[in-house]
């Protein structure tokens, strides 16, 4: 990779593709690091520095963002959606959804409103972090 901003975008693209295709086994720090050709510790440190959250937390929020869309836009059962996005039970999904969005999935389905998705990488100063490049905008 020429610079880290391209690498982080590539990682996000891989994450989204894997979630859409339900290939969660590819969503490990080891697999993502190998795809980017960086060490696991480097990817973990830089991801946290750029996003303000661990890769694990980002993956959880990203799964919830996809699940939120399905709750709103499909008639699939909440259990089907929960299982699709890696939750062990309807209850675990409901707890995570409520913690992230302040409302249960069933209440959100009845009255969908705008919610804050915690999956946008915050702006950063690439020179301050010592990684070069021009930022997240490509």
Per-segment meaning from a language model:
Residues 1-45:
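Glycine/alanine-rich phosphate-binding loops at beta-alpha junctions
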């Amino acid at each position: 990779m020429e610079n880290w901003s391209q690498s982080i975008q590539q990682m996000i693209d891989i994450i989204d593709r894997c979630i859409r295709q339900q290939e969660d086994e590819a969503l490990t720090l080891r697999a993502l690091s190998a795809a980017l050709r960086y060490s696991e510790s480097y990817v973990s440190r830089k991801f946290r520095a750029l996003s303000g959250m661990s890769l694990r937390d980002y993956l959880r929020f990203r799964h919830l963002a996809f699940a939120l869309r399905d709750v709103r836009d499909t008639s699939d059962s909440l259990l089907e959606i929960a299982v699709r996005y890696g939750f062990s039970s309807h209850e675990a999904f409901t707890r995570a959804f409520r913690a992230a969005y302040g409302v249960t999935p069933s209440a959100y389905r009845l009255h969908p409103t705008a919610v804050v998705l915690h999956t946008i990488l915050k702006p950063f100063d690439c020179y301050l972090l010592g990684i070069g490049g021009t930022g997240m905008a490509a």
